[in-house]
Amino acid sequence: MRKRNILGLFVGLIIGLYTVLGMSLFTFFNLKYHSVYYAQHIPHKEGTDPDLVMLVENMGWIYTPEIDGIRYDNDGTNAIINTKSKSFLTKSSGSFLYDKDNMTIGFDSTFRFEDVSYFSEEAKRTKVNESKIKREIRKDFSPIMKVQPKPLINLQWLFNIIYQSRFN
């Protein structure tokens, strides 16, 4: 009788442990795979772009369909290349970089404008308009964001708890 109780307790603990582990893994994968969807719906401060941040940060986790003119480079740092507009978006040392027309625009970890680097005299004469640049980025990479699937089990509330302080 005593062996039965110990065995039952042991089996119950193992089942409970596997259940908690399974739920934790499901939650982790759900938040990563649907991060762009959740980021599109998170309340955030003006000037921050959580969806663009999640697009690059979680490129290895999100749905990355084959789209004509879009290439994904994840052999070290994540980069998304638009071959039609000859631009790319990447993350480097905690910042985000957008490269187009012989200039690289730097953004901080919340996608707020930081700096510009020019690689030609012609590019130096170009005035940088932050809102115009962000519209170009959205135009170049919106085909990826538009096809992100809606989660079956919506964990928006948990995503908001985790990332709210970063984007406000």
What would you call each of these model-derived segments?
Residues 1-20:
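N-terminal Sec-pathway targeting helices
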Residues 17-99:
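N-terminal export/targeting and maturation segments
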Residues 87-168:
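Non-cytosolic head/periplasmic domains of membrane-anchored proteins
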